[in-house]
Amino acid sequence: MLHWIRCRNKKKGIHHPACSVFFDKHGELINYYKPIIPQSGEIIENEILQEVFDNVLNSYEEKYGELPKNIVIHRDGFSRENLNWYEEYFGKYNINFNIIEIKKNTSIKLASINGNIVNNPAKGQYVVNGNKAFVVTTDIKENLGSPKPLKIEKTYGSLDMITILNQIYALSQIHIGSTKSMRLPITTGYADKICKAIEFIPQGKLSDKLFFL
């Protein structure tokens, strides 16, 4: 499972796109990677996609002796890249892939309604409509407000939404830096933390050191 996020250096106006965080199917961190070439645009260029995926696939093969058969890509926000590139790239390796957008900022609120009684939704509750969904990953006491659900959208792939939501929920519960839920899955959550330490992340090198937690 791979996530990347675009990090911005506010002082220099530079974006560091595709800072990737790579996990195996058990939720174990394999590594993270910051590309060498920064960019100023919103769309991640094909050359950077190539750099990122070449490195993460090579690292997976070195660790497990084979390439993954399936990859789930979590995007923080919108995915605007060319799907044809993904199809051609992963097609060469016979790898199935899914692209999932995870949006943490949404005005939607969920509630649990039983007759005339309205309560906060329980952690793990969700609403699905086609390839879009909202899921609650945290508990909040009734007198402290209401939880903020994550907005989930599948933009490519064959995974069903229930499997996607189960994966995202599970990944939000296994943050090693705390006994509490992280709200975000560790894919996007760790990438957020990497962005806050982006100037200390070496370019062009794979690492599994979680100093940014």
Where are these regions (language model features)?
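Long, contiguous domain-sized segments
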Residues: 1-213
